[in-house]
Amino acid sequence: MDNGAKFMKMVIAVIKPFKLEEVRDALVAVGVHGMTASEVKGYGRQKGHTEIYRGAEYAINFLPKIRIEVAVPSDRVDKVVEAVIASAKTGQIGDGKIFVTTIDQAVRIRTGETDVDAL
């Protein structure tokens, strides 16, 4: 592992689906050039809800969310986290969570660049 690896972080945000474009725009504005977004389901304090289908009531225990992953140099983490908070926050239960983890290694497949150069 290269010394540059300790300077890489993964910012993972789980947000409401309708906030995706707003969050993407906020990340672009702070210099993020790429991200991964996945449709996921989950629950927390928001819990689920009930829906009626063909006259029967069903408990929906998992709610649709979007998981965003952004790999950044560690000196950019605060700006990325602030951008996600500012753009994803509605003030309601279920706004989501942000997690920051360390990346041990990164490789750009096309060029073979590694670690911070691969971001």
Model feature map: region roles:
Residues 2-119:
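Positively charged, small/polar-rich N-terminal and surface patches that mediate targeting and assembly
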